[in-house]
């Protein structure tokens, strides 16, 4: 089971349970996440939902890279994966109950987009948040390009999404990215505090307040997400994606300058970069599976 679901005392808890890959998102996990949030929405005994991950390393690190490698040879299959991701994000964002993100570890790429889909976010003080799309070959358009500027402002959103530097929890709190940051030992108590406060509210008015607050999020999402899915599908087998995946697997930096220069010519970028054997394999097809999944999962956008 990749997603655990419990209900107790009016609170539903949805927990991503793939710690071996830093709670990364594959299709079965996305389907389970969607279904559990729909279940919580329809359950009148539930007044608040907590979304979290197993372990202390990661809340969620976005797309499962083993699945993403397969799209190099079958880029049209990415459309189906992204559809599952969209459904999951919409189930979280559109939940009829307030959703509290309990950030037990790093939130990276699509993992941060799950965080952004929640209503409130509480993080342990050793957590980092990050997007790496332009660094590693993925467009961060599953919520980040749509919503980051609403939380932290346009300039800071550009800093996060273009520079791809890790942001410490306290800095994220100062920017308005998070609601509360506490020592790890106090994380559950802080989440409990929010949940108890939310349970002492009228359910219909709370739901309507969420809908009204989501106006700008819904507007930017509905105007961009379908085109983002098409763009990501068309480019799922591209040189940049292949090089990003290969550099992850081989634990080496991308030669961005050589990549940029080669893409300005009429030759395939891979020939100009002179990749290693492993990188060339990634460009020509899915690279071999890695036994070091946690490392490859640490930074990747949806």
Language model region names:
Residues 3, 90-204, 238, 242-246, ...:
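Crotonase-fold acyl-CoA enzyme core
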Residues 53-91, 107, 135-137, 220:
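Glycine- (often His-adjacent) and acidic-residue-rich active-site loop
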Residues 1-52, 90, 269-283, 296-302:
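Conserved CoA-thioester-binding segment of acyl-CoA-metabolizing enzymes
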Residues 14, 18, 33, 51, ...:
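Terminal peptide-recognition signature
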């Amino acid at each position: 089971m990749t997603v655990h679901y419990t209900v107790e005392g009016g609170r539903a808890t949805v927990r991503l349970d793939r710690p071996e890959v830093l709670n990364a998102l594959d299709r079965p996990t996305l389907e389970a996440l969607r279904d559990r949030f729909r279940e919580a929405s329809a359950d009148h005994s539930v007044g608040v939902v907590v979304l979290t991950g197993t372990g202390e390393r990661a809340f969620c690190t976005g797309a499962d890279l083993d699945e993403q490698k397969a799209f190099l040879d079958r880029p049209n299959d990415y459309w189906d994966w992204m559809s599952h991701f969209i459904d999951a994000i919409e189930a979280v964002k559109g939940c009829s109950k307030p959703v509290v993100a309990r950030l037990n570890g790093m939130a990276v790429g699509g993992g941060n987009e799950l965080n952004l889909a929640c209503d409130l976010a509480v993080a342990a003080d050793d957590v980092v948040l990050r997007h790496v799309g332009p660094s590693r070959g993925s467009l961060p358009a599953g919520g980040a390009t749509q919503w980051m500027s609403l939380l932290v402002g346009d300039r800071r959103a550009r800093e996060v999404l273009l520079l791809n530097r890790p942001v410490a929890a306290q800095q994220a709190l100062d920017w308005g990215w998070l609601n509360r940051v506490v020592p790890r030992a106090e994380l559950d108590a802080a989440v409990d505090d929010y949940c108890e406060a939310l349970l002492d509210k009228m359910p219909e008015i709370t739901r309507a307040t969420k809908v009204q607050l989501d106006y700008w999020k819904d507007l930017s999402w509905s105007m961009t997400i379908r085109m983002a899915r098409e763009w990501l599908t068309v480019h799922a087998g591209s040189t940049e994606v292949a090089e990003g995946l290969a550099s992850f697997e081989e634990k080496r930096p991308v030669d961005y300058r050589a990549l940029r220069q080669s893409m300005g010519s009429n030759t395939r970028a891979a020939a100009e970069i002179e990749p290693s054997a492993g990188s060339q394999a990634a460009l020509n097809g899915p690279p071999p599976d890695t036994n070091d999944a946690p490392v490859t999962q640490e930074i990747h956008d949806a």
